[in-house]
């Protein structure tokens, strides 16, 4: 593998926004585009040392914590290939007053979920890789024990989570509940693409969950299609306020991650995202009546039993999925 040429700093604030700055129009490399903090390694520097130096030179801030190594990728400009490492970090300093490096940057901004297209301004080549990298950092969440990354397919910077999603659905317990035993890697890849499309279309979708370096499962939020029978049944049960956002919360953990409270961490992260990032009015979770373990998690994270609907799933005493299985529905609002 090539030696590391440059580093990038995905500086994130308490609102999960990422700091970007605009390169001056006079710059030879990528003039006029919005970029993250970063630059080339100097002789003898490690990537981490270069990161600390670049952050202070370009913003005046001090690196507090290198949270996570997000990406290791290569890009080409004017025939030269460069290897870049990008890190999610936090900093100390006045985040409202960065010290822009004279002659190099002329504006700054904090990018949240609704601001991602700023990364495409003046980007005449249509290259989405930096935009997608920032989106990944903005959408990632951390709990006490988990890192929750938005599920995507390969996107030119990140490898995506298809292989890990295949492992989740290969777990016998997960495969049973999701009727996934016969799914192929191509089936799972299509599902990952669907999750990625959900992030772009709905500003929310599923995460893949890691405990340290170990795969724990997947979970998060989905917007239930307004045209689906399930949406109509839920609306009839819980009321029209839920139908404004149509958010459903769920999780699926591999065997090594079950029974240790991790589903609750995913659930609470999903509720926080729904209410504090999206401004949602209500969130539901539903599972088959026979899945008492998931219902217990719903109760522990503060959701209230609302009643039952019928949908395709498992029912007590049945050996096959049926179209009218009873599902327990739980609901909560932002003040719950």
Task: Outline where the language-model segments fall.
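Unchanged
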Residues: 41-65, 73-125
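Acidic pyrophosphate-coordinating catalytic loop
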Residues: 2, 26-29, 72-85, 316-322
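Conserved GNAT-fold acetyl-CoA-binding loop/helix
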Residues: 173-194, 205-207
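Conserved N-terminal beta-strand and adjoining loop/helix that marks the start
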Residues: 1-18, 213
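Charged phosphate-binding loop/patch that engages nucleotide di/tri-phosphates or the phosphate backbone
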Residues: 125-139
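Acyl-donor (CoA/ACP) binding surface of acyl/acetyltransferases
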Residues: 139-176, 206, 210-336
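A structural microfeature
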Residues: 20, 68-71, 217, 307
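Conserved Nudix-box catalytic region and its N-terminal flanking loop in Nudix hydrolases
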Residues: 17-57
